[in-house]
């Protein structure tokens, strides 16, 4: 109730400004041992049934913070105490860039969603690398890498290679982002020929587990092709899905006037779940599947787990649900695991298929 009142106040300020202020407040809380300890006591998962190990990394709980919130890894001390089982920072690019002109982040309140065209604003992979190397995070940290805007698509593999070389050694896993709608031509890199070059280049540069993040707007045939390529190349997994360019069934008025961008939150949930189910049917346990897109509560999270997701991510749900977002979801997952007679989280993965 209190957070809903705060949310109304937040909505009086531009979304990007609120993000800056809230993120600064979270970092301030986590900077001091007593307040960080208190936050950890209130929010961090403690039930051992939530823990899982995938691609050689132990995760204390399955819900992580999705890429986009902590673009430059400035809040690495925050995410574990706030209840997340891990965090994916970025997207970072080989060349630092300011992103698209403001305004570039918009609320869709009637849909509990967001529309963004941030454009990979970040300080660069070289700036993130030392933060990862010296971190004291209590949870795994992955790094999401994208293409620098000024780099032509023909040279994309070399650009991704640079980022992988810089952040790969200190990241628990790498996610190759070829699915944001906000960098011109980026989604074209999901074509199998181009994607093969990029993923092969990244794999040559790092020993960290490598995953690829895909768009919800791909055709089913394209999803199958990418899944097969991921298995062939020996990727650790697939993150599904990024934001959607679809405006179908949005309830928020005036969305047409907001311009281009990707939509996140509940509007992408159905397609995200559909893509997850298709991927699991295609690859089974040969790849780790991380589901993201419209996960608001424990019911949503559980639906993704039994459909085949080993890990989950949230961002928009965190914005709309507040600081206990991760805790409530993890508590709900633990209750469902025990009620269903599962001995571990991994036992529940794909159990509905």
UniProtKB/Swiss-Prot annotation:
What the entry lists under PROSITE patterns is as follows: DHODEHASE_1, DHODEHASE_2
The family database entries (CDD domains) matched by this protein are listed as: DHOD_2_like
Q: Where does substrate bind?
A: 71, 116-120, 177, 182, 242-243
Q: Name one GO cellular component term.
A: cytoplasm
Which Gene Ontology BP terms does the record give?
A: 'de novo' pyrimidine nucleobase biosynthetic process; 'de novo' UMP biosynthetic process
Reactions catalysed = (S)-dihydroorotate + a quinone = orotate + a quinol
Q: How is the cofactor bound?
A: Binds 1 FMN per subunit.
GO MF terms listed in the record are:
dihydroorotate dehydrogenase (quinone) activity
Question: Where's it found, cell-wise?
Answer: Cell membrane
Q: How does it sit in the membrane?
A: Peripheral membrane protein
Q: What does the subunit section of this Swiss-Prot or TrEMBL entry state?
A: Monomer.
NCBIfam families from the entry? PRK05286.2-1, PRK05286.2-5, pyrD_sub2
State the family it belongs to.
Belongs to the dihydroorotate dehydrogenase family. Type 2 subfamily.
What is the documented function of this protein?
Catalyzes the conversion of dihydroorotate to orotate with quinone as electron acceptor.
Listed name of the protein: Dihydroorotate dehydrogenase (quinone)
Species for this entry? Mycobacteroides abscessus (strain ATCC 19977 / DSM 44196 / CCUG 20993 / CIP 104536 / JCM 13569 / NCTC 13031 / TMC 1543 / L948)
């Amino acid at each position: 109730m209190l957070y809903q009142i705060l949310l109304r106040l937040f909505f009086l300020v531009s979304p990007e400004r609120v993000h800056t202020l809230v993120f600064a407040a979270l970092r301030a809380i986590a900077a001091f041992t007593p307040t960080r300890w208190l936050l950890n006591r209130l929010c961090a998962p403690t039930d051992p049934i939530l823990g899982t190990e995938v691609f050689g990394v132990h995760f204390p709980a399955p819900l992580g913070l999705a890429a986009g919130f902590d673009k430059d890894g400035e809040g690495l001390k925050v995410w574990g105490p706030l209840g997340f089982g891990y965090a994916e920072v970025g997207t970072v690019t080989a060349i630092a860039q300011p992103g698209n002109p403001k305004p570039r982040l918009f609320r869709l309140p009637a849909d509990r969603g967001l529309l963004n065209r941030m454009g990979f604003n970040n300080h660069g992979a070289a700036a993130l690398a030392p933060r990862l190397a010296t971190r004291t995070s209590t949870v795994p940290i992955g790094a999401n890498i994208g293409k620098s805007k000024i780099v032509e698509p023909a040279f994309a593999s070399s650009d991704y290679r640079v980022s992988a070389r810089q952040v790969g050694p200190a990241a628990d896993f790498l996610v190759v982002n070829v699915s944001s709608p906000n960098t011109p031509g980026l989604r074209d890199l999901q074509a199998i020929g181009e994607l093969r070059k990029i993923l092969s280049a990244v794999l040559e540069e790092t020993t960290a587990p490598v995953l690829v993040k895909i768009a919800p707007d791909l055709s089913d045939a394209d999803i199958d092709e990418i899944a097969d390529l991921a298995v062939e190349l020996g990727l650790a997994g697939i993150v599904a899905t990024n934001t959607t360019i679809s405006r179908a069934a949005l309830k928020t008025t005036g969305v047409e006037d907001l311009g281009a961008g990707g939509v996140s939150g509940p509007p992408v949930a159905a397609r995200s779940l559909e893509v997850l189910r298709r991927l699991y049917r295609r690859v089974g346990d040969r790849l780790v599947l991380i589901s993201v897109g419209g996960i608001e509560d424990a019911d949503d999270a559980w639906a993704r787990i039994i459909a085949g997701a080993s890990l989950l991510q949230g961002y928009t749900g965190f914005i709309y649900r507040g600081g206990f977002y991760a805790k409530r979801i993890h508590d709900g997952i633990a209750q469902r695991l025990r009620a269903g007679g599962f001995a571990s989280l991994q036992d529940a993965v794909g159990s509905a298929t």
